[in-house]
């Protein structure tokens, strides 16, 4: 489970080789530590971040800020994702 970065109390991470067939690039966001019900954000090939679900119930204000950070770092995230395949 590579942690990509931390934003305050939240970690942004992905699971290595998650699901079969392998899902497209996405990250999970959780407070404190990785959990199985973390918020999920898809990352498009253009670097746009799209909310899949907010299972960890992060407030809209914080989540919107985090999505902007994810988009700003989308190249790094995609590189890390591809290096873990």
Predicted regions and their residues:
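Negatively charged, low-complexity tracts enriched in Asp/Glu with abundant Ser/Thr
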Residues: 1-15
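Proteins with a high burden of low-complexity, intrinsically disordered sequence enriched in S/T/G/P/A and R
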Residues: 11, 24-26, 70
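A short, structured beta-strand/loop element
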Residues: 19-60
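Acidic, low-complexity intrinsically disordered segments
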Residues: 54-85
């Amino acid at each position: 489970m590579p942690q990509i970065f931390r934003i305050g109390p939240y970690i942004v991470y992905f699971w290595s080789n998650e699901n079969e067939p392998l899902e497209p690039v996405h990250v999970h966001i959780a407070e404190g530590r990785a959990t199985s019900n973390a918020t999920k954000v898809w990352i498009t090939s253009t670097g746009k971040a799209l909310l899949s679900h907010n299972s960890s119930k992060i407030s809209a204000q914080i989540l919107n800020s985090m999505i902007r950070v994810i988009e700003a770092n989308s190249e790094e995230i995609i590189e890390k994702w591809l290096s873990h395949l």
